[in-house]
């Protein structure tokens, strides 16, 4: 089995692939102070509850946007799985994906892996929207190259900033309001956050398509992407497995 680990700014995803399909996925809050022992204790406990034998793991691939967390995940793989993990972004690691931007070294590992995961699953030119701490729009050409993109604040980050900067505005749940014009503070905030974000997504997608000049397929992924299902006019597919699929592809290309 292969263990893939996606360390994001907010959440960390652990997923197991048995050579044919994904068999388990677990999610925890990202905490760079957690040791390898902490991760192992949590992971083994969940695996035992579901009857999963982690001693069968023969490889590990890690994508991390949190540099301070990498040491502990490397130790997790070495000490508890007895494997040497592959880390996205390490010298010599092959992704097979050209990065056609001015400073390739500045592109986050998660964005490259998501672009790869989308390319192997969907034909043609793509826009990959990843909604997490930040919302990224990544452009993938039909020949499998990362062509650049857009980075904007994530929906939760925007909502938290609104609450933190304005003392009288409450924390709210993100949900679609019944109408655009809010009739109280909460519905007005929900309209601004939810509908405002849908307009951000749809507006930027339309501008990207106009600039690109060729048909593009739009795929949404990330922790809050499902919130937009049925509300966006431009998203074609919702796919939560893009990044772990990309990690699996990296593993295959570096065996």
From Swiss-Prot:
Free-text remark on how the cofactor is bound: A monovalent cation. Ammonium or potassium.
Active site: 110 (proton acceptor)
Biological processes annotated in GO: coenzyme A biosynthetic process
Principal location: cytoplasm
Residues at which substrate binds: 108-111, 185
EC number: 2.7.1.33
Keyword Repeat applies: no
Catalytic activity, as annotated: (R)-pantothenate + ATP = (R)-4'-phosphopantothenate + ADP + H(+)
UniProt: K(+) binding residues: 130
Cellular component annotations (GO), alphabetically ordered: cytoplasm
Pathway: Cofactor biosynthesis; coenzyme A biosynthesis; CoA from (R)-pantothenate: step 1/5
Main EC class the enzyme belongs to: transferase
SUPFAM superfamilies named in the record: Actin-like ATPase domain (SSF53067)
Gene Ontology molecular function, alphabetical: ATP binding; metal ion binding; pantothenate kinase activity
Record flagged with keyword Ion transport: no
Annotated positions binding ATP: 6-13, 133
Compartment(s): Cytoplasm
Keywords: ATP-binding, Coenzyme A biosynthesis, Cytoplasm, Kinase, Metal-binding, Nucleotide-binding, Potassium, Transferase
InterPro entries in the cross-refs: ATPase_NBD, Type_III_PanK
CC cofactor: NH4(+); K(+)
Subunit text: Homodimer.
Primary role: Catalyzes the phosphorylation of pantothenate (Pan), the first step in CoA biosynthesis.
Family, as annotated: Belongs to the type III pantothenate kinase family.
Name of the protein this chain belongs to: Type III pantothenate kinase
Organism whose genome encodes this protein: Hyphomonas neptunium (strain ATCC 15444)
Gene it is expressed from: coaX
């Amino acid at each position: 089995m292969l263990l893939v680990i996606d360390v994001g700014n907010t959440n960390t995803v652990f997923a197991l692939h048995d050579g044919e399909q994904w068999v388990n996925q677990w999610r925890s809050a990202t905490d760079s102070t957690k040791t390898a022992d902490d991760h192992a204790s949590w992971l083994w406990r969940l695996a035992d509850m579901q009857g999963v034998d982690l001693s069968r793991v023969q490889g590990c691939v890690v994508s991390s946007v949190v540099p301070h967390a990498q040491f502990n995940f490397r130790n997790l793989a070495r000490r508890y799985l007895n494997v040497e993990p592959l880390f996205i972004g390490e010298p010599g690691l092959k992704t097979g994906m050209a990065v056609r931007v001015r400073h390739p070294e500045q592109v986050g590992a998660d964005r490259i892996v998501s672009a790869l995961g989308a390319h192997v699953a969907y034909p043609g030119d793509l826009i990959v929207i990843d909604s997490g701490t930040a919302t990224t729009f990544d452009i993938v050409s039909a020949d499998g190259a990362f062509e650049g993109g857009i980075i904007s604040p994530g929906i939760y980050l925007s909502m938290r900033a609104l609450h933190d900067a304005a003392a009288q505005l409450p924390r709210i749940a993100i949900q679609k309001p019944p109408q655009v014009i809010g009739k109280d503070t909460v519905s007005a905030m929900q309209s601004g956050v939810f509908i405002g974000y849908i307009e951000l997504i749809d507006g930027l997608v339309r501008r990207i398509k106009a600039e690109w000049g060729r048909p593009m397929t739009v795929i949404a992924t990330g922790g809050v992407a499902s919130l937009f299902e049925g509300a966006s006019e431009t998203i074609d597919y919702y796919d939560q497995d893009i990044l772990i699929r990309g990690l699996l592809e990296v593993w295959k290309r570096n065996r």
